[in-house]
Amino acid sequence: MPSPSKKTLALVAHDGKKAEMVAFVKDNIKLIKKFNLIATGTTGKYIEEAGLKVQKMESGPKGGDAQIAAKIVDGEINGIVFLRDPLGIHPHEPDIFMLLRLADVHNIPLATNLASASILIRAL
């Protein structure tokens, strides 16, 4: 169960960006440990292998992006690091756009690359 005293950070990475996400988490482990973590399924598995506790949703194509989007609406997410592969084709593109749109609607900070992710985790 997430700690109510910690902010919640959602971590999502497309397949071509999962290695970057794991490297980012490892490079920033002291800061990342200050958050409750939630992630899409496969990304969450890799983050667990890096030694962190994470609440895993379904994988993105199976509805994980939509599950995280619902948590945005419910006020359970404080920030999102979403390392997207802008050159890839994703069958669940509507869910991705929904997550991005709801982050904007609910004014949730969203980082889509390593530079902005580094700023986001320090600012939350």
For the regions a protein language model found, what residue spans apply to each?
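Nucleotide donor/acceptor-binding cores
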Residues: 6-8
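Short, glycine-rich nucleotide/cofactor-binding loops
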Residues: 10-18
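Histidine-anchored nucleotide/phosphate-binding helix
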Residues: 19-30
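Short internal beta-strands
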Residues: 34-43
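Short hydrophobic/aromatic-enriched beta-strand-loop microsegments
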Residues: 36, 53-63
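Mid-chain, well-packed structural core segment of small domains
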Residues: 63-102
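Ser/Thr/Gly-rich flexible loops in soluble cytosolic domains mediating phosphotransfer, phosphorylation
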Residues: 88, 96-124
